[in-house]
């Protein structure tokens, strides 16, 4: 059996933006008795490194940098063990060159800043905070300046959630990120149902109106835009990836169930293989082979549990293989890489 490629670790559930695609910002950050300690998280990383010394640890949460006491021990340990470490941040915490330099010298192997558009109003609207565009762009510029000063080779990326509000401007968006900002890459993540619990004032489930209003409807135009951009900017996008993106949006369009969010019928066929390469560990030390809670989970309590999970989970994998949930389009779990070149992590 191949070892897991990625270990996704939740380190918090709080955020300082108010993204329309996520409800984490509605929660107050609390420390619960069930949460694993920094030391327990370190033990999990150490065991993962024995499973795959060439693996990658992905720091997850809301805005992970809001908990530096948990963030930096992970990046330092990954550097010590020779593991790759990946981190996506919204840019609000990267406010000066000193911090940018620290990210490049002590932080993850690659740094990704969330950026939803080259148009400030579109980014700010989807992120829920006026001025968040300026903070994200400033973070990218600071990181690039620090990289030049340090003569570092740390990749610096932008990542966007693509939806009705921004996909038609993808050409201009690529131009802005690659030629104006001069970041190394623009990663595309496709809008999925809203993360977190959607409840009305009475505490009852409510419709996923943002997903319904903003998931891309015209999958054929989207496909043509992707073809145009990969040729113009020499992106080397894999044709199978572009077809998967078209299939995902075509499925949502045909199902006519976007308003039901995660209760939708799903894609035409399975497009995810998270179960073959990922382990996700939440704040309570509960491990899964994907982010969905509909499949069995495993509590990591002692040394050896992570290894046992990976090698004994074939019955769970068999349950997961036919899964067609909309989250299969996520860059973290999607079966097909965006680019033809095989990278350590999908883009």
What are these regions (language model features)?
Residues 25, 60, 114, 189, ...:
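Conserved residues at the C-terminal ends of beta-strands
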Residues 8-10, 58, 88, 159-160, ...:
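Short beta-strand segments
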Residues 26, 68, 130, 144-147, ...:
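A general structural signal marking secondary-structure boundaries and capping sites
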Residues 62, 192, 325:
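Short, solvent-exposed turn/loop segments enriched in Gly/Ser/Thr/Pro and often Arg
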Residues 64, 92, 118, 163, ...:
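Short, glycine/serine-rich, charged loops/turns that create anion-binding
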Residues 1-110:
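Conserved alpha-helical substructure of the radical SAM core
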Residues 1-5, 25, 29, 262-347:
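Flexible mid-to-C-terminal extensions adjoining Fe-S/redox cofactors in radical SAM and related proteins
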Residues 31, 105-106, 110, 114-271, ...:
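Radical SAM enzyme [4Fe-4S]-AdoMet core and its adjacent flexible, acidic
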